[in-house]
Amino acid sequence: MVKFYSGNYSVRQKSANADKCICYAEHHFNSADPSANYALAVVAANASLTSINWGMWYAQAAASLLGTKVFSPSSTWPGVALGGIDGRGNENLLYTDMPAILLEPLFVSNPKQAAQLKQATWQDALAKTLADSIRKFFPDGGLVAFSIGHKGKTSNPTDCGAAIHGGGHECEYAEIVLKKAATLLEK
């Protein structure tokens, strides 16, 4: 079973804790230079080893799917940004009691990746990658928490994240992918 959480990020996390969710996935897409092309998962500075391993697996699977690189931090966990990138993303997960990752599988500023994201087949593939990662790391099942990055914050209700090359916004496509992943997990 999957439940979507909204509100400010700390409220989402605390609500998922109260609901005893088994895991928490917040979906974003990255934006930077148009040539940027790596997949990554952010985990909080206080992340469990399960969060780190889940994030590493997800980032590697997303990179393989998209034919891109894996984020290579100066750590022992390829694909994982422990504590976020310069702290960005850490607060999005810091208050969870369960394993939690923030997904950044591609760059919406990269024209090729933005075009892929707009195609249903790529959305389906990203959703399957996320669903597969959850089934792999949480085989006993339970309530899964999904958070659509940027969307639904009470502190900034119009925030929809980065503009996508060629039109659209990050939160629109994060929501599409998460809804497709939820459908897969609830089968």
Regions found by a protein language model. Name each.
Residues 1-187:
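Active-site-proximal helix/loop segments of hydrolytic enzymes
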